[in-house]
Design a protein with these regions (language model features):
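Extreme N-terminal leader/targeting segments of oxidoreductases
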Residues: 14-92, 110-118, 618-660
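Glycine-rich FAD pyrophosphate-binding loop
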Residues: 109-136
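Rossmann-like flavin
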Residues: 166-274, 286-287
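C-terminal segments that line or cap access tunnels to active or ligand-binding sites in enzymes
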Residues: 273-288, 351-353, 358-585, 589-603
Length: 660
């Protein structure tokens, strides 16, 4: 009986196994059929797409949803657009008079061909220029809150200034003057950094990055934008980068700090990849003859005044009120403002175009003088651009999120000071460091000199003198700034933000190498220093994500655009004159439908030659073939070299020192 039961059990098990096997076979067959059907369907789809494909460039330059298209090359650059349809019935209201606002007015006149009397610039202060300042204050002295570093591929900036007449030389443009000046007197530094009270740090054009540091930078370079939303630089780099000379160059030149946006850091790499080699000695940079107010702003003001543009000062715009229609349109209907302190409104139609500078890096600037520190409550003085943007943003999500940028002044501030002296002892020490006479009118430091061992991380620079047209011949104006304003100094035992101009001078003279016993008298009697604390100077570097900055022309807007450093435009980088002018060009071209391309951001990031060059330079002359690459990449070196041998690729790799 037992054997019979066992045979039956085994038979049942075999039947089960056969059943499972049969089911598996059926399933496998079905899967194979489904897979085959999918492949056949995919083949048909590809065949259909290919059969419908036609090579053409029609539509290549059609406007995008914002009413613009991007272009490159001389054909578009030298062409003048036709007069936009209906422009004679339109008016423009421009809020602010900084570089972006004035550029918008210039583009309205030149390319939009709008009559000057129909363009209204509304400025809260009694002086134009915004952050591009440069002034002599009789009660304080010369004041420059900052300087402007420029390069040859600021495509929109130079497109504008080729048309702005010089106010010094009849018959030439601002660009002509600038071009000739920088050809005759090219910029470069002979001492990038000092240590031990004025000794050359001998950075010697090296980045001093480890292999791991280079790989961290390359990884960031290739990371998608969306993977960097709300991330800081500390999230993507470690001490392999932060302890390098590269990082000293980077944070002192661009004012990046460890807690700033990793996304913006990546964009900077990509935007200026063609200038990596010029980073250590500033040979990539170009500067104006005078301060940016006299060199850039005043010629624009003159151009606009001649065209009949209306400037209305002491007019603080507090809000723009929108109507939203059922079909998704957003129409600016009212400008709310205060004129000389009295509240008033400006009624708008769809034919009234409104351009608003949202946010400002110099809003709430606190001024000191030689005997007073720049102390005050920045929160109280946030009533201008920031509150205007907040009021606008409260009406629609597409208008951005200003609080992402202006809510933490401990992370967005730094302080600068303008130092003026004619003392020979100080000037001799300057000349010893920068190896140039500051009084020749030519390049002096060629960019900032950073004091590597300064607790404040103090840097200073002297541009061509005089920086002001009215400056005395024996006077030298020095610009000093520090990134770490809340730590005590090396000579002055207090934070920079608590220091008077005299005390800041003492700290600077100490790092300059002036004998310690001479510092007090020189700082008190031989120098005039004006400090300026800027609570939001690096607000645009704060970590962000898509939507935090509004598009230049937000979706649905028919008569409204944003301008400046807190408006979103693809691929370009903030804290540049180019960014302000680019947003202005896009705003005017988009709202007026100007039939001409906006020059695209220079495409060096897509140029294999620049990528090869920059890789070798970042590694201080080494080839990537000389280092251990991760994993299987290392094993691919020889096969790849064999594959390209005798080809134009091998020639290219040799020309750019990949094959050495």
């Amino acid at each position: 009986m037992f054997h019979c039961e066992r045979r039956n059990t085994m038979a049942n098990k075999n039947h089960v196994k056969l059943g499972v096997a049969a089911a598996a076979a059926v399933a496998a067959g079905a899967t194979a059929i489904v897979s085959k059907n999918k492949k056949e369907a995919r083949k048909k789809e590809v065949a259909k797409r290919v059969s419908n494909f036609r090579n053409t460039e029609r539509g290549r330059f059609e406007r995008n949803s914002k009413g613009i298209y991007y272009s490159n090359g001389n054909y578009e650059a030298f062409a003048r657009p036709l007069k936009p349809e209906g422009v004679d019935e339109k008016s423009a209201y421009i809020v602010g008079s900084g570089l972006g606002a004035l550029a918008a007015a210039c583009f309205l006149v030149r390319d939009g061909q709008m009559k000057g009397e129909r363009i209204h610039v509304l400025e809260a202060m009694d002086l134009p220029g915004g952050a591009c300042d440069g002034i002599f204050d009789p009660s304080r002295g010369y004041i420059m809150r900052g300087g402007r570093e420029m390069e040859n591929h600021f495509e929109c900036l130079w497109d504008l200034f080729r048309s702005i007449p010089s106010i010094e030389t009849p018959g030439v443009s601002v660009l002509d003057e600038y071009y000739w000046l920088n050809k005759k007197d090219p910029n470069y530094s002979l001492c990038r950094a000092t240590v031990k009270q004025g000794e050359d740090a001998h950075t010697d054009g090296k980045f001093n990055l480890s292999q791991k540091g280079c790989m961290e930078i390359m990884k960031l370079f290739m990371t998608k934008d969306e993977d960097l939303y709300d991330k800081t630089i500390e999230d993507v780099f470690d001490d392999e980068v932060f302890d390098s000379t590269f990082w000293l160059y980077w944070l002192t030149m661009f004012a990046f700090e460890n807690w700033h946006s990793a996304l913006e850091m990546k964009l900077y790499f990509q935007r200026f990849i063609h200038h990596i080699g010029g980073l250590p000695d500033f040979s990539a940079l170009k500067f104006t003859k005078y301060n940016q107010y006299e060199s850039l702003i005043l010629p624009m003001i003159k151009y606009l005044e001649v065209a009949g543009v209306q400037f209305q000062y002491k007019t603080q715009v507090t809000n723009v009120i929108f109507e939203k229609t059922e079909d998704g349109k957003k129409i600016a209907r009212t400008i709310e403002c205060k004129v000389d302190g009295e509240e008033t409104t400006i009624a708008l139609t769809e034919k009234d175009l409104v351009f608003v500078t949202n946010g400002s890096c110099t809003e709430g600037t606190i001024y000191g003088d030689h005997t007073h520190a720049p102390t005050g409550d920045a929160e109280v003085r946030r009533s201008g651009c920031w509150s205007l943007w907040k009021n606008i943003a409260a009406q629609d999500a597409s208008f951005g999120h200003p609080e992402k940028f202006c809510s933490d002044i401990d992370k967005t501030n730094w302080e600068s000071a303008t130092v003026t002296t004619s003392n020979q002892q100080i000037i001799d020490q300057i000349q010893k460091i920068c190896k140039r006479d500051p009084r020749t009118g030519n390049v002096v430091t060629g960019g900032i000199v950073s004091c590597m061992d300064s607790k404040w991380l103090l840097s200073w620079t002297i541009n061509r003198q005089g920086q002001f047209k009215e400056q005395k011949k024996d006077e030298v104006c020095i610009w000093v700034y520090s990134l770490f304003t809340d730590v005590e100094g090396d000579y002055v035992k207090k934070p920079m933000k608590e220091c008077t101009g005299e005390e800041i001078t003492q700290e600077w003279l100490y790092h300059l190498g002036i004998p310690v016993e001479d510092i007090p008298a020189l700082a008190k009697d031989e120098v005039v220093t004006v400090p300026t604390m800027m609570p939001y100077i690096t607000a645009f570097f704060m970590p962000r994500r898509k939507g935090d900055r509004p598009d230049v022309i937000p979706d649905g807007c028919v008569n409204f655009a944003f301008l400046g450093q807190f408006a979103e435009t693809p691929r370009d980088t903030i804290f540049t004159t180019e960014y302000s002018v680019r947003t202005a060009m896009e705003a005017v071209y988009g709202l007026l439908k100007v039939d001409r391309g906006v020059p695209e951001v220079w495409g060096s990031v897509y140029d294999i030659r620049e990528l090869l060059d920059s890789t070798v330079k970042l590694m201080d002359g080494k080839s990537p073939l000389d280092i251990e690459l991760p994993g299987p990449l290392n094993a691919l070196k020889l096969p790849l070299l064999k594959a390209v041998k005798g080809t134009v690729i091998e020639k290219l790799l040799k020309e750019h020192q990949i094959i050495q």
